[in-house]
């Protein structure tokens, strides 16, 4: 399976802001399967994107010992999120969840949840996609994350 994720927030990091994330699920050959979106308050765009990726990991992560089944490919336009889950979290875990600047990583609850699932042997193939560059499904999840289109509308258009 292939997934596109995006997170968004208006008033990023400010009190009583509005944010959300969107996910689109596709078959391996790119056919639309489903869409999902969730709205939040008092959040950040990074937190929402991490939540989207974590949701895919928890619902579609593949056990490594099932080598007959390739991990789902997950596209995100957030370098922060891709680097966090593909690289940085391993260093932070070795340092008792302290970054090189001696600070605790932001969104540690989400990062630890992903890491724990990873350590149980679950995997996704998380890849960076360039944002706001005309990539069809990345544009759709951006609209889901910002609330500019509903899950129902996406399902009606592409389902």
Specify the residue positions occupied by each region the protein language model found.
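RNase H catalytic domain
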Residues: 8-14, 55-140, 144
């Amino acid at each position: 399976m292939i997934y596109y994720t995006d997170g968004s927030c208006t008033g990023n990091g400010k009190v009583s802001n509005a944010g959300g994330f969107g996910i689109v699920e596709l078959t391996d050959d790119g056919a639309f399967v489903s869409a999902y979106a969730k709205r939040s308050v008092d959040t950040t765009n990074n937190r929402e994107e991490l939540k989207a990726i974590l949701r895919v990991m928890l619902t579609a992560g593949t056990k490594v010992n099932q080598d007959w089944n390739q991990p789902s490919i997950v596209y995100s336009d957030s370098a922060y999120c891709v680097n966090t889950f593909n690289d940085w979290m391993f260093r932070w875990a070795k340092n008792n969840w302290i970054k090189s600047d001696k600070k605790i990583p932001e969104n540690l609850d989400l990062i630890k949840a992903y890491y724990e699932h990873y350590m149980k042997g679950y995997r996704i193939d998380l890849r960076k996609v360039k944002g706001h560059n005309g990539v069809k499904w990345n544009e759709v999840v951006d609209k889901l994350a910002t609330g500019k289109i509903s899950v129902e509308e996406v399902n009606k258009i592409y389902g």
